Every structure is written in structure tokens, then in C-alpha cells.
């Protein structure tokens, strides 16, 4: 058998859900700056040793992982406009080491709304959800 035929596709480095991308798009629209991208990063600190951070960034560094999500623009009615919007998630190489295989999602329920990171590399997490140990 051909060695190339035996290769299985590798799982995505990071998953950026449609719910998260739609929320980011809405926040970018509120800022009225189409050049903004969402950057997710890891810093030292928090209850468990590391914590997640989010910020908007116009700059894309040459070594950033860039995950693009195409979204159909929504209008006020039930259907879409047919126009597409591109939302970008940026991760620096150091943070990517801790986020490999993670999912960036956005969740709304009766207790509130927040971005959620489901990280398979987190050995323990804090009750606040923004701190973890690797």
C-alpha cells in the first residue's frame, strides 16, 4: 500500500466554533472596526497557575496561528443576506502549546453568557473557568 494512502487527517490544532465566531463578529461590528481579530492567549497567574485571556488585535504576527471562520451575514429577518464575513482567531506560538486541541466556544444560558475554552491539556481547572493547571 502507498504510504500516503495510509495517512489519516490530523485533528484540527484548535477548534473555533460557529457560536464563538458569531459572537466575535457581533463585538467587532459594535466596535465598528472590520480590521479587528480575536486573540486568545495564556498568561501565568490565576488560581491554578495559568489563565486564559482574550483581546482584540489588528496586528497579525508572522508566527501566529490564524484560524479563519466564514460566516453568512445575518439580517434582521429570519434569513441571511447571502454575503459572507470572515472572522479570525489568533494564537501566538507559546500559548498554542497549552491550547493544542482545545475548543473556543461561546455559551449563553440563564446564568449568563461567556466564551468557554474546553482544553484537553488542562489537568485541573478553577471554579471560575478562566484558570487552569497544565
UniProtKB/Swiss-Prot annotation:
Task: Give the function comment from the record.
Answer: Required for insertion of 4Fe-4S clusters for at least IspG.
**PANTHER family in alphabetical order:** IRON-SULFUR CLUSTER ASSEMBLY 2 HOMOLOG, MITOCHONDRIAL
**What does the entry's cofactor note say about binding and number?**
Binds 1 iron-sulfur cluster per subunit.
Q: Which family does it belong to?
A: Belongs to the HesB/IscA family.
Keywords noted in UniProt: Iron, Iron-sulfur, Metal-binding
Q: Does the keyword Membrane apply?
A: no
Q: Which Pfam families match?
A: Fe-S_biosyn
Protein name, entry field = Iron-sulfur cluster insertion protein ErpA
GO cellular component terms listed in the entry, alphabetical order = cytosol
**Under the GO molecular function aspect, what terms does this record hold?**
2 iron, 2 sulfur cluster binding; 4 iron, 4 sulfur cluster binding; iron ion binding
What species is given as this protein's source?
A: Coxiella burnetii (strain Dugway 5J108-111)
Say which domain of life the source belongs to.
Bacteria
Coiled coil spans = none
PROSITE patterns assigned to the protein according to its UniProt record, in alphabetical order: HESB
SUPFAM superfamilies linked to this entry: HesB-like domain
Query: Quaternary arrangement and interactors, per the entry?
Result: Homodimer.
One GO biological process from the UniProt record?
iron-sulfur cluster assembly
Amino acid at each position: 500500500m502507498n504510504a500516503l494512502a495510509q495517512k489519516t487527517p490530523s485533528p484540527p490544532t484548535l477548534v473555533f466554533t460557529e457560536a464563538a465566531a458569531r459572537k466575535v463578529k457581533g463585538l467587532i461590528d459594535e466596535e465598528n472596526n472590520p480590521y479587528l481579530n480575536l486573540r486568545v492567549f495564556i498568561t501565568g497567574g490565576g488560581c491554578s497557575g495559568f489563565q486564559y485571556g482574550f483581546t482584540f488585535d489588528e496586528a497579525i504576527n508572522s508566527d501566529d496561528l490564524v484560524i479563519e471562520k466564514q460566516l453568512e451575514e445575518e439580517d434582521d429577518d429570519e434569513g441571511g443576506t447571502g454575503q459572507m464575513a470572515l472572522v479570525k482567531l489568533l494564537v501566538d506560538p507559546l500559548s498554542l502549546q497549552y491550547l493544542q486541541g482545545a475548543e473556543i466556544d461561546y455559551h449563553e444560558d440563564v446564568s449568563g453568557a461567556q466564551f468557554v475554552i474546553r482544553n484537553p491539556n488542562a489537568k485541573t481547572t478553577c471554579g471560575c473557568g478562566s484558570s487552569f493547571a497544565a
